[in-house]
């Protein structure tokens, strides 16, 4: 699939809080899930089970991945999220290598700075990584 244009991802504060809460609850392991997005604005955060149960990687459980694909088929934009408990909100080489959905946004929640979590968005396609601006607020 061709590399699609980048967009701004708007995350209402309540959903941002939910992403951060999930990351904190699962630490020291990475958390993961997906976000239903419409017209560039996140509408719902859906937690998934990290099949890897690891601080160094994630894998969405099959049921969640199937549900995210169904949203895509229904015309929603999809964001996959995961956390980096001890590193920046930037894709690791493993994240890049395993990114299998070039038209989805990859959101990374970093807890590296303790009380100042960071959420950043990325488009990853064919090894190319481009940041998608994330705007927090209603």
Per-region residue spans from a language model:
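Conserved, mostly hydrophobic/aromatic
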Residues: 80
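Conserved beta-strand-loop surface patch within small alpha/beta domains used
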Residues: 1-77, 86-138
């Amino acid at each position: 699939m061709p590399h699609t244009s980048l967009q701004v991802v708007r995350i209402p504060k309540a959903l941002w809080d939910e992403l951060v809460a999930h990351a904190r609850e699962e630490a020291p392991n990475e958390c993961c899930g997906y976000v239903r997005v419409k017209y560039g604005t996140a509408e719902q955060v859906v937690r998934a089970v990290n099949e890897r149960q690891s601080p160094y990687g994630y894998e969405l459980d099959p049921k969640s991945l199937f549900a995210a694909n169904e949203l895509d088929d229904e015309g929603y934009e999809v964001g996959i999220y995961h956390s980096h408990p001890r590193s920046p909100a930037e894709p690791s080489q493993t994240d890049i290598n395993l990114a299998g959905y070039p038209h989805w946004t990859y959101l990374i929640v970093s807890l590296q700075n303790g009380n100042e979590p960071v959420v950043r968005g990325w488009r990853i396609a064919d090894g190319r990584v481009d940041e998608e601006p994330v705007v927090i607020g209603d």
